[in-house]
Amino acid sequence: MFASKVYFSLTEILDAAHHRTHNEWHQLDHRPENLLLPGVAWGDRWVRSPDCAQASAGLAPEYARTHYAIMYWFREPLRATLDEFFKLSEFSFQWGRSPQIGWTKRPLRGFFSPVKGYVATRVRVSADALPRRPVKGIHVTVSRLRRHDALTQEAFRWYDEVRLPDLLHCRGAAGAWTFASDDLFAPPWDDSMPAWSFADSGSRSAEAFPLRMTIMYLDEDPLEYLADVAERDVAWKAGGRVHDTSTVEEVFFSSPFRMIVPWEWNWFDTAKAAS
């Protein structure tokens, strides 16, 4: 695996007048500096345009106003990598190059461990190369796990053996990666982290609410991908290939995003004019 950890964030812009400034800063300043760090394997950013927002689902109202998603992949040694990553963030502030402070809100941000990568048979690259491969968009699903038992394991098996392979046949699907939040991987001897390790067989309902995330990488318009999934689901349901996983997970956020093309940042101009 080319990276042992990822940082993922959902971002809301509180003032529509700042979308262009925010994109200029992140795409032309912040991201290039981050990618220069030796421990940063890759980093990308996507926009949840108004039409993507209309095609979204999920139970968490705090994510409903999300405009952007950000992800960085980190190499080992992780401690040194993150030290440099956060040091650059502070230096950027000291240089006067953090204009996003004051108009951004991040309803979701945190570290995840990559679980497994999948690649469509038509795509020639490896799963490790998939995040670096150009796409037209992605689809992100974030779920909160309700439990950590045999039923959950069976749901994960269904995702791995049935659901994700099926989705890779949908229009534009190039591949996928699954992720699990850090609290699922705390060693049982580490009291500083929530007790959600496999060694803790008796009390997985602690206060922690671990997250599971899936990202689909798309070569076609993300809305066309979703339309194809909906059409194929009719036959898949009739054939018993679609399972109800609501007993083991709550889908907090499920949304398509578009790739951000440099200098083409006009998705929210109507909202800006109205404000």
Residue ranges of model-derived segments:
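Macromolecular interaction modules
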Residues: 1-275
